[in-house]
């Protein structure tokens, strides 16, 4: 059961065009020469993802793509999945739907207990990613910055797997014990991730990374007679296999001897820390730490886990104090390729993770809520992250100075295959700017296109949205106080045409495709600061670069250095594209992209109301209740072996989920 050597197969009818062939060739040349760090400077709409897909296919190395948020990760995951249907394309983001970290505020003597809700679907994706990385080389993992957080020792995860093979001697009871040790639970009634059921000489296992199929293991005496992968719902045989690896139900599982040794070390460190608190005359902290830690030790000894077990991860991993945690990067082979997308945003996030985490935990340790080992349950420091890089491509329309200084090569991708030019940029005075804005948006409306308006404050965003609404323009505002569900719904409304304009402070500068947007209006463009920096202006102007009528209006009474640089760069890119179009006889065309592509799995618990609701259903909440009811009905049929009825109900559930964008 070695690592699969299957090659990447890029499936597409498209051929590289514009600057793509040149960029692909140069990036590959650099990689093959051993260049460690390089940058792909690709303008919005130039097809950077397609370029990267070609590089991945030709270079043929396991690849990790890191982006700065879940929505962009999901968009890239979906695009790579379509381009590489025969290869392992995986999605690795934080599995929390809700997360309130443990904290202590000494000024108020207030302890906040950790509270979290884990999304089982995202947890399945994470297991699927680590299993693919360990079992095959034709793998692309698209991850958020959560990939630098502790994940458990890869050696334990890999070595503890149960290797099933047809014909091997294996006692059925021993297999059941092993499954329990790996964190699997017996469940003879429902099909759930990381469970198993037993009927006579047959064990059925639902793996940790999927609920689509189950593994049926048939015994004859003490021998594995047959291993079959079956459809989890209708129990049809998918295929019979010679071997199958069952991986642990958690990334944090450790062998029993390791656990026993870890508990001894925890107790030893506890005694020393309690002694230290007492020597400082801090009896309350000493007593608190002793009681809490001894309770955790007993829970781990009896049940194999406790609340907040990650705070003891250093002991289970065999790490010394201060040593970095194991992360997703440690699961990859040494020759992996790293791609950091939207690097000007992702790099600062990677830098900031460690300090933010440490300041919170130091208080917990200082006041006796946690042992000092809690400080080692942390994300990687930025320097530690860099040490784990083999070869990296930074990707951005506006790379940061840090990436550019480190890169041995900067590969430009300015020309778009569609022939689309960068938006026309106009600077207009602030006087009567709102009247001018209304006039421009009405022109956009006539063409059935959309607009984005950027302000400098949340209050101004709301006021402008109200002003536009009063003038019969369908406008809504977006700012940081809106949660991700509301933001996702707003984007969908804009793309579908339910609204004409979104007004906001920091509007979707990076990544998301909004081909319907032909106008970007930047209010107070001459106010210097982060939101009006060169990078911010280029990214914002780029939001209108996927439409043939793309235009950016900068309302300002003076031209700042950032504005001047952004305008010059946009004009330079327009000129390059114009010359290319003229030379090759290309007529620019707007990008067309179905709206459904925008928000399918970005947040797996996010929903949006369909235009036409099913009969008897009045709201999105009703649909969710209906799905829940049908799922119970489906499993009831399945348990009674009425698979045809179960399949019909499953199809009905699929239709409802599709309406909600959850398909």
From Swiss-Prot:
This is UvrABC system protein B. Residues 29-416 form the Helicase ATP-binding domain. It holds the Pfam family UVR. GO terms for cellular component: cytoplasm; excinuclease repair complex. Belongs to the UvrB family. It is found in: Cytoplasm. Keywords: ATP-binding, Cytoplasm, DNA damage, DNA excision, DNA repair, Excision nuclease, Nucleotide-binding, SOS response. PANTHER family: UVRABC SYSTEM PROTEIN B. GO terms for biological process: nucleotide-excision repair, DNA damage recognition; SOS response. It comes from Aquifex aeolicus (strain VF5). The gene is uvrB.
């Amino acid at each position: 059961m070695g690592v699969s050597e299957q090659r990447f197969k890029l499936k597409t009818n498209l051929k590289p065009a514009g600057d793509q062939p040149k960029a692909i060739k140069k990036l590959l040349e650099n990689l093959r020469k051993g260049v460690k760090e390089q940058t792909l400077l690709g303008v919005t709409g130039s097809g950077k993802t397609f370029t990267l897909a070609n590089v991945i296919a030709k270079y043929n190395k396991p690849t990790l793509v890191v982006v700065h948020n879940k929505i962009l990760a999901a968009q890239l995951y979906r695009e790579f999945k379509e381009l590489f249907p025969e290869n392992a394309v995986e999605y690795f983001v934080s599995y929390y739907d809700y997360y309130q970290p443990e904290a202590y505020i000494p000024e108020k003597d207030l302890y906040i207990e950790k509270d979290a809700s884990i999304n089982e679907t995202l947890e399945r994706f994470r297991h699927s990613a680590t299993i693919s990385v360990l079992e095959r080389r034709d793998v692309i993992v698209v991850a958020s910055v959560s990939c630098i957080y502790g994940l458990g020792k890869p050696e334990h995860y890999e070595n503890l797997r149960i290797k099933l093979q047809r014909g091997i001697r294996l006692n059925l009871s021993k297999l059941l014990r092993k499954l329990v040790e790996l964190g699997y639970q017996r469940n003879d009634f429902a099909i759930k991730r990381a469970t198993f059921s037993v009927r006579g000489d047959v064990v059925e296992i639902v793996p940790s990374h999927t609920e689509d199929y189950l593994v049926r293991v048939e015994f004859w005496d003490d021998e594995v007679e047959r291993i079959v992968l079956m459809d989890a719902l209708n129990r049809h045989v998918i295929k019979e296999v010679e071997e199958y690896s069952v991986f642990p139900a958690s990334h944090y599982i450790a062998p029993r001897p390791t656990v026993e040794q870890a508990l001894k070390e925890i107790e030893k460190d506890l005694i020393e820390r309690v002694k230290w608190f007492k020597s400082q005359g801090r009896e309350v902290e000493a007593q608190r730490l002793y009681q809490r830690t001894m309770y955790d030790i007993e829970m781990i000894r009896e049940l194999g886990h406790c609340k907040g077990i990650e705070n003891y991860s250093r002991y289970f991993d065999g790490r010394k104090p201060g040593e970095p945690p194991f992360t997703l990067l440690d699961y990859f082979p040494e020759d992996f390729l790293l791609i950091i997308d939207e690097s000007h945003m992702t790099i600062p996030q990677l830098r900031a993770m460690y300090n933010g985490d440490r300041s919170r935990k130091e208080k917990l340790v200082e006041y006796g809520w946690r042992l000092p080992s809690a400080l080692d349950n942390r994300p990687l420091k930025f320097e530690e992250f860099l040490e784990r890089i083999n070869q990296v491509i930074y990707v951005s329309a506006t790379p940061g100075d840090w990436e550019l200084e480190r890169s041995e090569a900067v590969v430009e991708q300015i020309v778009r295959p569609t022939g689309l030019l960068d938006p026309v940029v106009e600077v207009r005075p602030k006087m009567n700017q709102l009247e001018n804005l209304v006039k421009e948006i009405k022109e956009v409306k006539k063409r059935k296109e959309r607009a984005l308006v950027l302000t400098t404050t949340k209050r101004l965003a709301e006021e402008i949205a109200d002003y536009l609404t009063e003038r019969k323009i369908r406008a809504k505002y977006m700012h940081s106080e809106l949660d991700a569900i509301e933001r996702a719904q707003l984007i969908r409304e804009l793309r579908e045409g339910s609204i004409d304009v979104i007004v906001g402070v920091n509007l979707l500068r990076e990544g998301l495709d909004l081909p319907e947007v032909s106008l970007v209006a930047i209010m107070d463009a001459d106010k210097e600061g982060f939101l009006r920096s060169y990078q911010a202006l280029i990214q914002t102007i780029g939001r209108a670069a996927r439409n043939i009528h793309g235009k950016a209006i900068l309302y300002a009474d003076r031209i700042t250095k950032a504005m001047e640089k952004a305008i010059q760069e946009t004009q330079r890119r327009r000129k390059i594209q114009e010359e290319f179009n003229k030379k090759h006889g290309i007529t620019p065309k707007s990008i067309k992209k179905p709206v459904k592509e925008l928000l399918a799995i970005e947040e797996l618990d996010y929903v949006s109301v369909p235009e036409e609701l099913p009969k008897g259903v009045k709201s999105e909440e009703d649909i969710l209740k209906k799905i829940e009811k049908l799922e119970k009905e489906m499993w009831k049929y399945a348990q009674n072996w009425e698979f045809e009825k179960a399949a019909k109900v499953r199809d009905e559930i699929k239709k409802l989920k599709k309406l909600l964008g959850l398909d």
